[in-house]
Amino acid sequence: MRCPSCFHNGTRVLDSRPVDEGRSIRRRRECESCLNRFTTFERVEEPPLIVVKKEGTREEFNKEKILRGLIKACEKRPVSLKQLEEVTQNVERELRNLGISEVKSDMIGEIVMEALRDIDDVAYVRFASVYRQFKDLNVFIEELKDILQKERE
């Protein structure tokens, strides 16, 4: 590892510890030349996950987009940001565990909706109304009936 101060290539590791729930390693290093101490992080590089949109275009998966949608759906609801971040992480983990490099956007939407259904019904309906693009009030009412039916079961 090259020292950021003197650019010497010789450094030694003083301390290593796992961070980010074991997904990264934090290393404290010291330059053998100038004795400067600095920190580095090592993590596994995930292969890109490509989202195939409804119109056929492709873009790289962006968990921030999911988080923004969740925040909007949960606006003025008793749902913490931490819960939404966990949902976002769980969605990404579930998609990566599929072992495929491309995933359709509607699959992502369904996974997000299922997670929201367990957290807050109102947020679920808000998200579903945008995601499923309810055309009229009847479709909206049917979705509400569906939620009520599942709660009774």
UniProtKB/Swiss-Prot annotation:
Q: Which cofactor does it need?
A: Zn(2+)
Query: One GO biological process from the UniProt record?
Result: negative regulation of DNA-templated transcription
Gene Ontology molecular function, alphabetical:
ATP binding; DNA binding; zinc ion binding
Instruction: Fetch the InterPro entries from UniProt.
Output: ATP-cone_dom, NrdR-like_N, RNR_NrdR-like
Transmembrane feature ranges? none
Write down a Pfam family by its short name.
Answer: ATP-cone
Paste the cofactor note: Binds 1 zinc ion.
Domain ATP-cone span(s) in chain numbering: 49-139
Zinc fingers (unnamed), renumbered ranges = 3-34
| Superkingdom as given in the UniProt entry | Bacteria
| Keywords annotated in UniProt | ATP-binding, DNA-binding, Metal-binding, Nucleotide-binding, Repressor, Transcription, Transcription regulation, Zinc, Zinc-finger
Q: Determine if Transcription is one of this entry's keywords.
A: yes
**What functional role does this protein have?**
Negatively regulates transcription of bacterial ribonucleotide reductase nrd genes and operons by binding to NrdR-boxes.
**HAMAP family listed in its UniProt record:** NrdR
Q: Which family does it belong to?
A: Belongs to the NrdR family.
Q: What is this protein called?
A: Transcriptional repressor NrdR
State the organism of origin: Bacillus cytotoxicus (strain DSM 22905 / CIP 110041 / 391-98 / NVH 391-98)
Gene field: nrdR
